[in-house]
Amino acid sequence: MPSFDVVSELDKHEVTNAVENAVKELDRRYDLKGKGSFEFKEKELTVNLTAEADFQLEAMIEILKLSLVKRKIDAQCLEIKDAYASGKLMKQEAVLKEGIDKELAKKIVAHVKDAKLKVQAAIQGEQVRITGKKRDDLQEAIAALRAKTFDMPLQFNNFRD
């Protein structure tokens, strides 16, 4: 029986490239030159932003989002934490979310069932496997999932006949 997996993954190499591009953009901007920094921690998938003022942090977040989108990474995976003061500097953390949590998996399964397609959806850890009798049914399921916006970017992989 044909099947495919619904996942939410990040290409860590592309994220690294996006952060490096954001650092270059930060150096290019006259209003932010030498006043802020990005620090990417690959293991925790976090980006620490440091700046002198709150408005500079907001501009840096926009630069980071723009860099992610240019590298074809959905900005929805970015979770921005609250800014806090640390001495003379303002700091903020941006966490990159990866994987489908149980709540989102339940929403995906419910959406597939509500679409009344001839497919079955099963939660398997951080992914959802969708199985059907025909390839056309699976393509309809993909179209239904793409039409609805979830709070995480979804990818479809492991398509098997």
From Swiss-Prot:
- Residue ranges the record marks as coiled coil: none
Question: GO MF annotations for this entry?
Answer: nucleotide binding
Keywords attached to this Swiss-Prot or TrEMBL record, sorted alphabetically, are: Nucleotide-binding
- Annotated Gene Ontology cellular component terms: cytosol
Question: Matching Pfam families, A to Z?
Answer: DUF520
Q: What does this protein do?
A: Nucleotide-binding protein.
Q: What HAMAP family does the record point to?
A: YajQ
Q: Which family does it belong to?
A: Belongs to the YajQ family.
Under which name does UniProt file this protein?
Answer: Nucleotide-binding protein PFLU_4927
| Species this protein is from | Pseudomonas fluorescens (strain SBW25)
